[in-house]
Amino acid sequence: MSKTVRIPDMFLKASAASKRKSASNTENIPEKVPAGNENQEVKKMKLQAPEPTEILLKSLLTGESWSKLLEEEFKKGYISKIEKFLNSEVNKGKQVFPPPTQIFTTFNLLPFDEISVVIIGQDPYHDDNQAHGLSFSVQKGVKPPPSLKNIYKELESDIEGFKRPDHGNLLGWTRQGVFMLNATLTVRAHEANSHAKIGWQTFTDTVIRIISRQSEKPIVFLLWGGFAHKKEELIDTKKHVVIKTAHPSPLSARKWWGCKCFSKCNTELENSGRNPINWADL
């Protein structure tokens, strides 16, 4: 005779809860990217672990070439001070942009020997969901800030066939070799330049020097505005090309219009035997 076994309600409820949790976790897995749409490095970033509870900068720099080039830099005391400051911000309930895993986006996506152009910004955008580790760029779905709108306007007049995209994500430039570096890599939410004096510029000045000294091919540096112009002293101008213009901010837009820095950049790249940037590939 078969014997009926009754499973207690508490176990049935636990099993149902487990299934619901499993379904929820499945919904949170990032959607797969269609083949060919993004390179392997982008895919890795989309599938990376959740944001760390403690910020350790070296662990966030996953680009192999940059990890080697900056290995000694991460051993210096000022890096520990930056980490201490950032962790203090988080512990105080302050929001930091970009999220920790996106601080080094431009480093993690663009290997050192693939750099052909460097664009230097000042610090990340400080409003919600804007900054993601590329200077002047914002995430898709976020309205382009005024400076980026002016960049697009100049491109429309400078580059034949350029049509303003419906987003502000400049990842397409990074894929082509444009290293988009902010001098300061983090900012407190809604407070511009709030992290300008915590040590980041010591780090990014070192990065600029490394690019200048160790790049085997001429690099085009686009320096927009007085702040970026000061970085010229870090660059070997006998080896590399520096194009200085006004900043695309509305405050200096009159001098920005007509600068034609994008076509000039491509001319310099072609003169050195390198591929021009397809600025419309966004």
Swiss-Prot record:
It is found in: Mitochondrion; Nucleus. It catalyses: Hydrolyzes single-stranded DNA or mismatched double-stranded DNA and polynucleotides, releasing free uracil. One of its GO terms (molecular function) is uracil DNA N-glycosylase activity. InterPro entries: UDG_fam1, Uracil-DNA_glycosylase-like, Uracil-DNA_glycosylase-like_sf. Disruption phenotype: Severe loss of unracil exision activity. Increased number of germ-cell corpses in response DNA damage induced by ionizing radiation. Coiled coil: none annotated. Its EC number is 3.2.2.27. Keywords: DNA damage, DNA repair, Hydrolase, Mitochondrion, Nucleus. The active site is at D123. Pfam families: UDG. The gene is ung-1. Excises uracil residues from the DNA which can arise as a result of misincorporation of dUMP residues by DNA polymerase or due to deamination of cytosine. GO terms for cellular component: mitochondrion; nucleus. NCBIfam families: PRK05254.1-1, PRK05254.1-2, PRK05254.1-5, ung. This is Uracil-DNA glycosylase. Inhibited by UGI, a B.subtilis bacteriophage PBS2 peptide inhibitor. CDD domains: UDG-F1-like (cd10027). GO terms for biological process: base-excision repair; base-excision repair, AP site formation via deaminated base removal. Belongs to the uracil-DNA glycosylase (UDG) superfamily. UNG family. Residues 15-40 are annotated as: Disordered. Optimum temperature is 26 degrees Celsius.
